[in-house]
């Protein structure tokens, strides 16, 4: 499990570095404005939160991860990396 966590963290770090370098390159080419970078990141985070909330509505092993009308996962379920995980 620790290996999976380490791989996930390293993958995220590489993706962030790649995203920042690509954004800097586009900024240098005057394709995007510097303030647009942060707007895009905020939108991405909102999309991920939505995906995470949506995935918790999916039933795992016949049990709902999140009760109807609830905003958070319940019953020992947690939403991690767009998956319902039982803790």
From Swiss-Prot:
Gene Ontology CC terms, in alphabetical order: extracellular region
Record key words, sorted: Disulfide bond, Ion channel impairing toxin, Knottin, Secreted, Signal, Toxin
Superkingdom, taxonomy of origin: Eukaryota
Subcellular location: Secreted
Name under which the protein is recorded: U3-theraphotoxin-Cg1b
Lineage start: Eukaryota, Metazoa, Ecdysozoa, Arthropoda, Chelicerata
Source species: Chilobrachys guangxiensis
Propeptide: 24-48
One Gene Ontology molecular-function label: toxin activity
Expression by tissue: Expressed by the venom gland.
Family: Belongs to the neurotoxin 12 (Hwtx-2) family. 03 (juruin) subfamily.
N-terminal signal peptide: 1-23
Disulfide bonds: 52-65, 56-79, 73-84
């Amino acid at each position: 499990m620790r290996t999976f966590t380490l791989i996930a963290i390293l993958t995220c770090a590489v993706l962030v570095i790649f995203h920042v370098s690509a954004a800097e390159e586009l900024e240098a080419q005057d394709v995007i404005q510097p303030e647009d970078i942060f707007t895009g990141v905020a939108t991405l985070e909102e999309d991920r939160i939505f995906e995470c909330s949506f995935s918790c509505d999916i039933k795992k092993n016949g049990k709902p991860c999140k009760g109807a009308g609830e905003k958070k996962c319940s019953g020992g379920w947690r939403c991690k990396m767009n998956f319902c995980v039982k803790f």
